[in-house]
Amino acid sequence: MSEKTVKVQLVKSLIGTRESHRATVRGLGLRRLNSVSELQDTPAVRGMINKVSYLVKVIA
């Protein structure tokens, strides 16, 4: 059975954000603006996305 995945895209700049939020975005594998990362759909990843929901967009 294939693993469920989720794609996230960084849509807002990290300038002026909290250090913990920058670390969370980095943990999601996002570096530059508009970069996309495909991750396994786990509760931990969902929590990270929820924490920085104002910076990222789920695209798939």
UniProtKB/Swiss-Prot annotation:
Part of the 50S ribosomal subunit. InterPro entries: Ribo_uL30_ferredoxin-like_sf, Ribosomal_uL30_bac-type, Ribosomal_uL30_ferredoxin-like. It holds the Pfam family Ribosomal_L30. Keywords: Ribonucleoprotein, Ribosomal protein. One of its GO terms (molecular function) is structural constituent of ribosome. Belongs to the universal ribosomal protein uL30 family. This is Large ribosomal subunit protein uL30. The keyword Ribonucleoprotein applies. The keyword Ribonucleoprotein applies. One of its GO terms (biological process) is translation. It comes from the Bacteria. One of its GO terms (cellular component) is cytosolic large ribosomal subunit.
